[in-house]
A protein has these predicted regions:
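Conserved, well-structured core segments that form the ligand-binding/active-site neighborhood
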Residues: 96-269
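Structural motif
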Residues: 18, 55-59, 218-220
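General beta-strand structural signal in soluble alpha/beta enzymes
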Residues: 48-50, 79, 106-109, 166-168, ...
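Short beta-strand segments enriched in small/hydrophobic residues
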Residues: 4-26, 134-144
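C-terminal catalytic subdomain
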Residues: 246-346
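Extended hydrophobic packing segments that form well-structured cores
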Residues: 313-399
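Cofactor- and metal-binding active-site motifs of prokaryotic enzymes
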Residues: 2, 25-133, 143-150, 284-288
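Short, glycine-/Ser/Thr-/acidic-enriched flexible segments
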Residues: 22-24, 62-63, 142-145, 224-226, ...
Length: 399
């Protein structure tokens, strides 16, 4: 994986903790702080440092100036305090200073932050953004021309994610037909003789080689030109890559690729990119053909919906509780909602894998009145609270 600096992946997972107290504090305070933090963060590796801390522990009043000397613009910080000794008062003063200086911070009593899970969520949010730093993504072809709200400038990827976006024209690649078919995909279907499976496995080989050669952690593929010109889809190839943890978005959707990268780090698995096929009452209908195999059961091969050509994936979503997420094209706004799977339709006029999700009325109202785009991301599990914090960390407004 490409890196922008000398930090290793292990170093990026370490939370930086600082402490502050009045000038008369004894030399034993440092070791007391470390013992205290080990109780608060028994499962999170951390290091004590005054340089760009992720968490500052207040041990007493009179510690404000030292605290603000350690806080840097653009680097969010969690302010926690011990009980008593005017520590919370000092933390409150510093919290006000961060607000006045447009620095994102959160304030809590240390014990309460541990009991409520705030420290755990904060550490997760820090690691999400640190983990994305230095990664590399690729756009194969162009953003599909119908995705008028989903283009993301390369500069924005670099600014927000510290991710480099490489644009790769289709005509710069080898012809997919010259590739050996990918054995993992053929074996998944027991070397089924379905028309188009071998061709789909060749597309997978091409994309896998591209990702490996260019050191890509994620790709967005303009796939419709492939099926229109060569009558072969990338659906199964993208599904297999997503299943392996390699983010692969279809239709050249850069906004969705960004969200998939974020959710993959935050949740541990690549979410499903799906069309907003409709809403009815408090139900949302999603459909698409590139779902990771591990997210579905009863997998069948079908033709691609829009063209009735080649192959697409038809499966049954196995999750019950899910989180729905979407970035805006500028990556400055996000939609987040938790829902419950209520049905698995089989409509003939929609993409092959389909699911019905019950969402809060307020969330559905936002999808109708202020959608950020057609494509939505669905991740199994409940992650709304974490994702709200992850977005706040980078001043991304949740609608």
């Amino acid at each position: 994986m490409a890196q922008k600096d000398s930090e290793t992946a292990d170093q990026r997972s370490v939370i930086k903790v600082a402490w502050t107290a009045h000038k008369g504090t004894g030399p034993e305070t440092g070791s007391d702080v470390e013992k205290f933090m080990k109780q608060l963060m028994p499962h999170d590796p951390f290091m004590m440092t005054d340089q760009q801390p992720d968490i500052i522990l207040f041990m007493s009043g009179g510690s404000e100036m030292k605290a603000i000397s350690m806080i840097q613009s653009g680097h969010p910080v969690l302010l926690v305090s011990i009980n008593g000794n005017n520590a919370y008062a000092a933390a409150t003063e510093v919290m006000a200073w961060t607000v006045n200086n447009n620095i994102f911070a959160m304030l809590s009593d240390a014990a309460e932050a541990s009991e409520t899970g705030l420290i755990d969520r904060w550490c997760q949010a820090v690691r999400v953004w640190k983990s994305l730093q230095g990664r590399k993504a690729g756009l194969v072809g162009s953003v599909s021309d119908w995705l008028v709200a989903s283009d993301v400038p390369a500069e924005r990827f670099l600014e927000l994610f510290n991710v480099t976006l490489e644009k790769i024209p289709w005509n710069s690649l080898q012809d997919y037909s010259d590739q050996e078919p990918d054995a993992s995909l053929l074996n998944r279907f027991n070397r089924d003789t379905a028309a188009g499976l071998v061709e789909a496995a060749k597309v997978l080989t091409l994309l896998r080689k591209l990702a490996e050669k260019n050191g890509l952690n994620a790709i967005a593929v303009e796939c419709f030109s492939l099926v229109q010109q060569r009558e072969v889809t990338a659906c199964l190839a993208l599904a297999q890559l997503n299943n392996e943890g390699i983010v692969a978005a279809c239709e050249g959707d850069l906004a969705s690729m960004a969200g998939m990268m974020l959710l993959k780090v935050a949740t541990g698995s690549v979410p499903w990119l799906a069309n907003t096929t409709g809403t009815n009452g408090n139900r949302l209908l999603l459909s698409h053909c590139t779902v990771a195999f591990d997210l579905v059961s009863d997998i069948k091969l079908a033709t691609h919906f829009e063209t009735d050509l080649s192959l697409a994936l038809n499966g049954t979503i196995t999750a019950s509780d899910v989180t729905v997420f979407r970035f805006s094209g500028g990556l400055d706004r996000a939609f987040i909602a938790e829902g419950r799977v209520t049905g698995h339709p089989s409509l003939s006029n929609a993409c092959r894998t389909q699911v019905e999700i019950e969402l809060p009325q307020q969330s559905l109202a936002l999808l109708r009145s202020r959608p950020l785009g057609n494509h939505l991301l669905m991740a199994p599990g409940k992650y709304a609270e974490l994702l709200h914090l992850v977005c706040a960390y980078k001043a991304i407004k949740v609608i």
